[in-house]
Swiss-Prot record:
It comes from the Archaea. This is Probable N-glycosylase/DNA lyase. Pfam families: HhH-GPD (PF00730), OGG_N (PF07934). It comes from Methanothermobacter thermautotrophicus (strain ATCC 29096 / DSM 1053 / JCM 10044 / NBRC 100330 / Delta H). DNA repair enzyme that incises DNA at 8-oxoG residues. Excises 7,8-dihydro-8-oxoguanine and 2,6-diamino-4-hydroxy-5-N-methylformamidopyrimidine (FAPY) from damaged DNA. Has a beta-lyase activity that nicks DNA 3' to the lesion.
């Protein structure tokens, strides 16, 4: 399957730290992942070649459904050229120097996005992505195709029954572990103090709340509902709404976005509430992409390091 994509940087999008899911498995310039297409586990390989995304499924699935899934995950229907014009109008076109072609990387599984977003709180991208990969490997279903094994993300019912454990500060470097060591609880997957949050949120989503309701809700009501979940504060809720459900008004704020926004708007002294209100008013339905481009530019241009050192 060939999908015209225009300006799209597949690798940058995969590695931009969006909390929908870990980056897909890279193999010789292509990326592979297991998708569920009309109930069928289907590993796919995607490769970006000169404005065309080549999609190769490992099994026979309906092509229309597969195409729609890929277009959704990589937000290929979004008019990125229109967004570039918007950046120019807002005097933010400098972010294109390091971020051109970056798109949203949306969840293939909303529940995985919920857990990924909780796991990412106050945590490095490397650590939370490894944690999610461990959770998949331990409690997801294994699917092997052509000698390559992929794991689904476990259901809320499965994670509800997983032990929290007591290995909060486990060293994550596997070469420092005994050869017969095996992970058997959540904390040993590196989620630390978030383990009880993950279990309780899994229980709520298994027994009390249908996460699919979010799709049909407006942003404010959906955010209020998500804040009832264990381990979900304002930033995590906005990550779930953005990457899990593409609520474009969402503007996730963490310590780095806070510093970036105060850096580019000197004298405003934003707090989190005023920053979100400003972003929604100033950027409207482009707020999601503005946040994505601002953070990616700061990370790739060195601004993030300067802000960390207090020299920005």
């Amino acid at each position: 399957m060939r999908i015209p994509v225009g300006d799209f940087d597949l690798e940058m999008t995969q590695r931009s730290g969006q909390t929908s899911q870990p980056p897909w498995r890279e193999v010789e310039g292509a990326f592979r992942e297991l998708l569920i297409i009309e109930g069928v586990p289907c590993p796919v390989e995607v490769r970006n070649e000169a404005g065309v995304l080549r999609v190769r499924p490992y099994v026979d699935v309906p092509q229309k459904t597969l195409r729609e899934k890929i277009e959704y995950i990589f937000d290929l229907k979004f008019d990125i050229e229109d967004f570039y014009t918007f950046l120019e109008d807002k005097n933010l076109s400098y972010t294109l120097d390091s971020s051109r072609g970056l798109r949203l990387f949306l969840a293939k599984d909303p529940f995985e996005c919920v857990i990924s977003s909780i796991a990412s709180a106050n945590c490095s991208v490397v650590r939370w992505t490894r944690s999610i990969e461990d959770i998949r490997r331990l409690w997801g279903q294994a699917n092997t195709f052509n000698g390559e094994t992929f794991h689904t993300f476990p259901s809320p019912h499965v994670l509800t029954g997983v032990a929290e454990g007591s290995l909060e500060d486990l060293q994550r470097a596997e070469d420092n572990l005994p050869s017969d060591f095996s992970f058997n609880d959540l904390r040993s997957c590196g989620v630390g103090y978030r383990a009880p949050y993950i279990r309780e949120t899994s229980r709520i989503l298994a027994e009390e709340m249908d996460i699919r309701r979010i799709d049909g809700m407006d942003y404010d009501d959906a955010r209020e509902l998500l804040l009832e979940l264990s381990g979900v504060g304002p930033k995590v809720a906005d990550c779930i709404l953005l990457y899990g459900f593409r609520k474009t008004e969402a503007f996730p704020v963490d310590v780095w976005i806070r510093r970036i926004m105060n850096h580019i708007h000197p004298g405003r002294n934003f707090n989190d509430r005023s920053m979100v209100e400003f972003a929604r008013r100033e950027y409207g339905e482009m707020a999601d992409y503005v946040q994505l481009y601002l953070f990616n530019h700061a990370r790739r241009s060195g601004l993030l390091d300067r802000l960390r050192q207090g020299t920005g």
